[in-house]
Amino acid sequence: MIRLERAVAEDLETIISIQRASFKAVYEKYQDEYDPYLEDRERIKWKLVERPNSYYYFVKEKDEIIGFLRIQTNEELTNAWLGTAAILPQHQGKGYGSEGLRLLEKEFPTIKQWDLCTVLQDAGMGAFYEKNGYRQTHIEPEKEGMDMVYMKKLIDK
């Protein structure tokens, strides 16, 4: 059974390890200086420990950590930015990310709008988010051969 577990400060090294493993292939393909693969330890620690309204959740099956999801919410807990969805490569394509997103929505039932951005040229990621109810809002060029697509999901409750 898949479940979410909130990460704490002591989980920093695990988060860094998962983030690097999950984004290595994307970084190698696009060589983007803002790729999560390159995010430094202190910035990740700040997001995990100090940044207000920033939440990391491990996606777990039994006691095995499959990956993590990171969101940033507004004060009212009505809007959220899905900042990082990191599923370990050996677990990708098996439904863990979709189930993690579904559980995250249950964890934050007051959030009515979910936003994110991903690499437009990475068709698999765009299709993954569309399958999970996200729709494109706009595209911004990042660099030659790489554009960021912004996506939104509205929850009617």
Sequence positions of predicted segments:
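A short helix-loop-beta-strand connector motif used in the catalytic cores of GNAT acetyltransferases and
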Residues: 45-57
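A short beta-loop-alpha structural element at the N-terminal edge
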Residues: 3-17
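A short, internal acetyl-CoA/4′-phosphopantetheine-binding micro-motif in the GNAT/acyltransferase core
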Residues: 83-92, 118-120
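Conserved GNAT-fold acetyl-CoA-binding loop/helix
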Residues: 20-46
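Conserved beta-strand in the GNAT
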Residues: 58, 64-73, 79-81, 86
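Conserved acetyl-CoA pyrophosphate-binding loop and the N-cap/start of the following alpha-helix
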Residues: 91, 95-103
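Conserved GNAT acetyl-CoA-binding A-motif
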Residues: 107-119
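Conserved active-site alpha-helix within GNAT-family acetyltransferase domains
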Residues: 98-99, 106, 121-139
